[in-house]
């Protein structure tokens, strides 16, 4: 009986040591996959710009200065990064983040078929906060083009990529960076929406913190 208790105690100790390592490995794998997805988005934007007089995908008239995580409007119109679908990528899953609950790649693919409005896990800057319309414009050097969409509403969490611990950021030259984030709205890369489903929360603080 004593020997059995000793064995159980040893197993418990080993489990307590291994579980954090396993959790860390899973988190790291999601982080790598997230970087891969947002990097693919950057490459698609580059291809799009080469076919469109150097311009990045626009949202729609009147929203040129907005940042948005929307791919498709309820009327079926693809906007912003959604304009990359079909012509520049056939895989809608790249718009999902494995570390953003409810907005993983497979969930985005599922929503493409069943929901009128299609959200991405990533916030697209468009021409807001001083980002020039032409991708290769010198003004865009060291400026971010997209990032994990981390958002908190008055009623609770809506978008919580990587548990608000860090954010994956895509820059105009297609390189990606992973930076520490905070769940406190507007402190780093997390924004706050007045209500669930608000399309255009104030995201200027995100780009202020991403740009170098």
Segment roles from a protein language model:
Residues 32-212:
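Short, well-structured segments within or immediately adjacent to enzyme catalytic domains
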Residues 1-36:
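Amphipathic alpha-helical segments typified by the pilin-like N-terminal helix
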